[in-house]
């Protein structure tokens, strides 16, 4: 991924291994990452890593770079959103390949989904929201819960 070396500030190999072997698949390990300051630092670090990657890529290069992932059939709706950027291995049914473009689309869809849910919590608490979150990606799928208080 980084032929000239990793960008400054990325997790070191030990932390990367801990992140990939965490018992949680959808959140950071609360035994390692509990303090708000540390969580904000890791968020900043992740965003900066994404910016470093995108700044060195073109749309074409992002579409041509693929990464292996395991799929046990938990997310069938994923294929309805990502199209050509996600393909199942022809020989091993549980192996899928994501393009780098798809990974960044996924990040965007996840971020706006979480922002939408934060806004729902604010509305339930009687607080105002000031930004309209676009309903696209996963939230645009039929049956996605977009209810508000």
Language model regions located:
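Acidic interhelical loop/turn segments
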Residues: 48-105, 127-139
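Short, helix-capping/interhelical loops that line the mouth of catalytic, cofactor-
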Residues: 1-56, 60-61, 124-149
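A hydrophobic membrane-anchoring alpha-helix module
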Residues: 106-125
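A broad "ordered helical/assembly scaffold" signature
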Residues: 26, 30, 34, 38, ...
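Generic structural signal for short, flexible, solvent-exposed coil/loop and linker residues
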Residues: 28, 92-93, 110
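Short amphipathic alpha-helical segments with heptad-repeat character
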Residues: 40, 44, 101, 105-108
